[in-house]
Design a protein with these regions (language model features):
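Flexible glycine-/small-residue-rich
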Residues: 4-6, 26, 47-49, 62-64, ...
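Short acidic/polar hinge/loop motifs at secondary-structure boundaries
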Residues: 5-32
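Extracytoplasmic
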Residues: 17-19, 28, 38-42, 55-57, ...
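Non-catalytic regulatory/gating segments with a bias toward low-complexity or hydrophobic composition
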Residues: 22-23, 43-45
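Residues embedded in well-ordered regular secondary structure
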Residues: 51-183, 281-283
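A surface-exposed, glycine/aromatic-enriched loop/edge motif typical of exported proteins
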Residues: 73-122, 213-251, 305-307, 372, ...
Length: 532
């Protein structure tokens, strides 16, 4: 669970320059107050905001970087590969002309000692008098599909204000070329954000934050799976099949990962994320603060990919087409998210006893709509569109909605920084579960003893800053399930393995009611801090 300024959000759409702090809550004792969504822990992100009276400041920074892939898989040398194949399968190889493995190893040794002694064409391809084809050049198929990438980042911000009015405006841009050997591997993101805070009266403050992020990711995508093909042996030639080697494959590109990257069409993914965050703060009494927060977050996802149709050849010398039936795929998804938080905090002391009590209410709702379409057999491959398909047109849509409602509290107790106690609790409900098991209570308690503050440790105070023993216990929920999984539905399942003739479709109840799950954590530890 990722909370950005106390509200769930997408960390990938946040400009790193706008982040003030990041806190990770890993155990149930600290995460229990976040209820049924904190099963995997909580990441708290706080964005930058001016504090107090601030003179006008204009900041600009940039970053230029190069990146290269590391720890690449190591391919076996061709001679070792051929020897292993000979030991396992015999002397006849499976490539064009059924070459002899033993002759290949001999030719390879000769070629290494004197390359001009063997007449090769293209990428080290030798056709013997008996029609068998031997591949002499070795290469790193993984390395051949990669290059050094370049990235540049730019950020600008303006900050200022008085003791009554404060503001911050920022914008950021990142452009990454990617490490694949193509201009189709790119990522770009633009962020703008603004914050304003006004002390309307001594006891009332109004804050407003707005942000907008737009990103575009483009990656080459092959219907054959370029990454999977990196398992090919190191003799696979790059480039195209030379003339005179194979009549069927003459002039066609070889089936290698680098060629697939070059010929494949890019899949394009666009994200737009506008967000508005409003916060009202009231301070009616000393130590007592009431806060009301409202957030609207919209996420727009737009995906498109056209498979294209490419004719290629293989080391067997054949001719093939991928895919045999080209298609255009488009997907759009819209998500509207609303969140309300209302909570109060009271901080007070009774002698040496310090208390901090917080209680509040939270409600969130999300509505998502997805549409997807595939159009087969494009008439104009240079400008593919859903309407220009000459074959099948498929369209589907999905709708998803859920809400969360809960009340929470936290009590902190501190006695002279020696004895520390924290109690948390949240009564949470989620629409993802049946009514009879929709709500759950998730408590936690943690205690600490700072031994360094005891009188018998006074002699260590000049070098020992803290020696704390702590223990905690907590229970958190898990609502990370589909929104309607508790509703029994009839779905279509295709049964394979031949037990139903022709793979006929059968219908069955495929889901069972879900129950809220609870994760328990018991922890203990010690903290030691030295003075220097």
């Amino acid at each position: 669970m990722i909370l950005i300024d106390n509200v769930e959000g997408d960390l990938d759409m946040v400009n790193p320059e706008d982040i003030e702090t990041v806190t990770v809550l890993k155990d149930a004792a600290s995460a229990a107050i976040y209820g049924a969504r904190a099963a995997g822990g909580v990441i708290l992100v706080t964005t930058k905001r001016p504090k107090g009276e601030t003179s006008f400041q204009l900041n600009y920074n940039n970053n230029f970087a190069f990146a290269t892939a590391m720890n690449l898989p190591e391919q076996a040398p061709l001679m070792e590969y051929l020897q292993a194949y000979s030991d396992a399968a015999g002397d006849q190889f499976w490539t064009m002309g059924s070459p002899s493995v033993s002759k290949w190893m001999g030719y390879l040794e000769q070629y290494r000692n004197n390359p001009s002694s063997i007449p090769t064409v293209g990428d080290g391809i030798f056709k013997d008098t008996d029609g068998a084809v031997y591949y002499m050049n070795e290469k790193d198929l993984v390395k051949n599909m990669l290059e050094t990438s370049f990235q540049h980042t730019h950020n600008i911000s303006m900050t200022g204000g008085t003791d009554k009015l404060r503001y911050r405006l920022s914008a950021g841009f990142i452009d990454n070329d990617g490490v694949l050997i193509t201009d189709k591997d790119k990522y770009r993101r633009m962020n703008v954000s603004g914050f304003i805070s006004a002390n309307v009266t001594k006891w009332f403050t109004q804050e407003a934050t707005f942000s907008y992020a737009h990103s575009k990711r483009m990656e080459p995508k092959s219907a054959l799976g370029a990454v999977y093909s990196t398992r090919l042996a190191s003799f696979y030639p790059e480039g195209n099949m030379p003339e005179g080697i194979s009549a069927a494959g003459d002039g066609l590109p070889f089936f290698t990962p680098s060629n697939q990257i070059r010929w494949s069409n890019p899949e394009k993914t666009l994200y737009d994320n506008p967000r508005i965050f409003l916060k009202s703060i009231l301070k009616p009494l000393k130590g007592f603060e009431i806060a009301f927060e409202y957030t609207f977050d919209k996420n727009i996802y737009d995906y498109s990919w056209y498979t294209g149709s490419v004719v290629y050849t293989t080391v067997q010398g054949g001719k093939d087409t991928t895919p045999t039936n080209d298609y255009l795929q488009k997907k759009k998804r819209y998500t509207d998210y609303n969140s309300i938080n209302l909570y109060g905090t009271y901080d007070f002391s009774l002698g040496n006893h310090q208390f901090k009590i917080m209680a509040g209410f939270n409600q969130e709702s999300s509505y998502q709509e997805t549409m997807e379409a595939l159009s087969y057999g494009q008439a104009v491959i240079e400008v593919p569109s859903l309407g220009s398909g000459t074959s099948t047109l498929k369209a589907t849509d999905k709708y998803n909605e859920f809400s969360v409602r809960g009340g929470f509290f936290r009590v902190n107790y501190n006695y002279q920084d020696k004895y520390l106690l924290e109690v948390n609790g949240r009564y949470d409900g989620s629409s993802k579960f049946p009514k009879e098991s929709r709500y759950g209570f998730f408590p936690s308690v943690s205690a600490g003893w700072n031994i360094a503050q005891e009188k018998f440790m006074e002699s260590t105070q000049n070098w020992l800053g803290s020696l704390k023993l702590r223990a905690s216990y907590g229970m958190i929920g898990n609502q990370n399930v589909p929104a309607y999984s508790f509703i029994p539905t009839m779905a279509v399942n295709n049964k394979y393995n031949g037990w139903i003739s022709n793979g006929n479709y059968v219908t069955a109840i495929t889901s069972i009611p879900s129950l809220v799950s609870r994760n328990f954590t018991l922890g203990k530890g010690r903290d030691i801090r030295h003075r220097y």
